[in-house]
Amino acid sequence: HEAVDFEPVVDENGAPVISHYGLQKAKVKEFKAVPLPYFLEGPARMMGYVDTETAKDMYKKVKETDLYDKKLAMYKTSASIEECSMENGRCRAFTPGWQERENVFLHMEYKYILAMIKAGLYDEYYDTITRALIPFLDPNMYGRSTLENSSFLASSVNPNEDIHGRGFVARLSGSTTEMISMWIEMMMGGKVFTYEDGQLVLNFDPKLANWLFDEGKVTFRLLSTCDVTYVNNTGKITYGDYAAKVSKVEINGETVATEGKIVGEMAETVRDGKVNAITVFFE
């Protein structure tokens, strides 16, 4: 906002009142809103609070803006801020596509991608992660192991083409937290444990693309101690109207449920780390 109408602040003697900045104080009477360029943080936060259709429309519109780096198929922190004043913050001081300015800040991009799956944009989510998640990148471009995250990647607006897509400052950043949240949404459906009618419920409601199943199976570790294997020989995805559905859940070869949840004492046993393996079958 810019102050377009204001009056100086003076004391009882008419002398200017000076602030701790060494400048005269003023009482603003009117502001003018000056829109900033697009920043990814807006849709990353908003997408989690709207319905699926609104989220889908938002996804399409964001992808049509300069927030989307077409060369890298990844999302930048903002569109060009070249016309912004330095008053808008330190990000303006950096070279475009570097550090905080128009780069692929991994934590923010992952936050946006997580919002996709939470909003029910499963097809859009899987189309995005095969290009934007670090394990899917070309290691030669990324410049380091694709098993580790970076603070940021230089985007294609950087004047040095040799570093486009290269990761800088490898560390355990906020992107790791967002990745764990994505993993939970994919493997369990987000609500791992719930409480229904006075009983603990362990829910199996994965949102998995069919290509994630290797010979009809995918295995992951739950709560650090329990290996969960999904058996899906249908060739179907596990989300949407035509998804494969859970037919039974087995522990030690014994069927403990005929739907996608374990209820009561057995759910408590799993939560307490006393179960080493669970097999979930789809049909």
Question: Language-model features: where?
Answer:
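Acidic, mature catalytic/reactive cores of soluble proteins
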Residues: 1-283
